[in-house]
Amino acid sequence: MTSAPLAARLRDVAGPLFFPVTAFGPDGAVDLAVFRAHVRAGIDAGAAAVFACCGTGEFHALTPEEFRLAVGAAVEESAGQVPVLAGAGYGTALAVQYARAAEEAGADGLLAMPPYLVVADQQGLLHHYAALAAATGLETIVYQRDNAVFTPETVVALARTPGVIGLKDGHGDLDLMQRIVSAVRTHRPGGDFLYFNGLPTAELTGPAYRGIGVTLYSSAVFAFAPDIALAFYRALDSGDDALVDGLLDHFYRPLVELRAQGRGYAVSLVKAGVRLQGLDVGEVRTPLTEPTAAHVKDLIEIIASGRALLAEHAAAGGGA
């Protein structure tokens, strides 16, 4: 656990937010040694924060004990260099148990995922996240997606909830996000509520989200191609439009189109990408399935295209 307040550390980040995959061995058990290597490699590559056991990390497929061990391993590998956040989800009672396990394991904060299966009204969602935030001393980011999509008024209430520091948007409705940002700015002036672009390949919509003031984003690509993810992050931050557009056109858009070819590819393609870089993190757990051989070949070509573009950009004097 780091000493500085989480919100302040995340507000001042200078790199992508890293969502590691959870490694499984040939027997299907969590491989903590490989997971540690994956987390350490990401931190060494320039991750600004680690979000362990979240969507990309197959939170849904982990037992409470596996979750506790993996979060603890991520905390140990971070050693205070960057904040570590952990996923927490399902119904309120179980989400609280995961949150307390994350706190005991030394995490700095929580990513609160949507409640399991149920479709609740806005008041019910607010009560759920307020109870989760009150259950520990960890600061909480609420994940908007699927069955947890909020009105601007609800987000204003969340922003006033002790312990809730931000909203990660995985819904992708820019009109709604603009109204949310405006409502919180109006009704909680001077506040420091954080917003994150949390779409599956957030870089594709990075320029659009920056237009409404959302500069923080999760990077699934960072898990398997940190060089490309960092180059894009720096180009977007510095206004290198040529590199941003090149990577969007020749890497990120093809990747998103490939991701759309199979259910669960937002996770299984990332895991395949990590394996392609030489770290055997195993396969995804059921009910997710592995990408087809043809799609893995496509992924190899997309990664090669992205790296070729970086090499051309560097050769032209643009840096990387």
Swiss-Prot record:
GO MF terms, alphabetically ordered: 4-hydroxy-tetrahydrodipicolinate synthase activity; 5-dehydro-4-deoxyglucarate dehydratase activity
Pathway: Carbohydrate acid metabolism; D-glucarate degradation; 2,5-dioxopentanoate from D-glucarate: step 2/2
UniProt keyword list: Lyase
Any one biological process term the GO annotation gives: D-glucarate catabolic process
Enzyme Commission number, as recorded: 4.2.1.41
Domain of life the protein comes from: Bacteria
Record field: catalytic activity: 5-dehydro-4-deoxy-D-glucarate + H(+) = 2,5-dioxopentanoate + CO2 + H2O
Family per record: Belongs to the DapA family.
Protein name listed in UniProt: Probable 5-dehydro-4-deoxyglucarate dehydratase
Organism: Streptomyces griseus subsp. griseus (strain JCM 4626 / CBS 651.72 / NBRC 13350 / KCC S-0626 / ISP 5235)
